[in-house]
Amino acid sequence: AKAEGDSVGGIFEIIATGLPYGLGSHTQWDKKLHARITESIMSVNAFKGIEIGMGFEEAEKLGSEVHDEIGWDGEKYIRHSNNAGGIEGGMSNAQPIVIRAVMKPIPTLIKPLRSVDIETKEDKLAHKERTDSCSVPAASIVAESMLCFVLADALLEKFGGDTMEQMKAHINISGNY
């Protein structure tokens, strides 16, 4: 693409681990964890889609192939798979949160596309600019940061505290994750 003066998009994955169950809400539309994550990541320019866990593959599967079975390991509840991507019913389930997002090719091209001069209405080529042929690696870091903001906010809502030490203490006494 770079040699041709073009650009490419791509798909990246973010995995958040070590989170407790119960972040988010199963009742309030604006507090559901998957909705908050999606809103924050999709607010970044050029991101065009997001999936959590198995995501769009679920459309081709039966419920018995999608839903994660629950077990007991002698100390805590576990899931035998993580097709839900760490979020069920709007809340975290203590499994890794797995997110994939797609970014479109960036629009600035060294080999410009056809356009129209808005003053003269004449056909023109778009302005040539210095550009990267692929911004997906950099954009994935931005998306990871957006996810961190959402998770930090959800942790504060659930556990509170004036300091990190207080919040860690609240997390430690609330359950075995």
Language-model regions, residue ranges each:
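Internal helix-turn-beta structural module
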Residues: 108-177
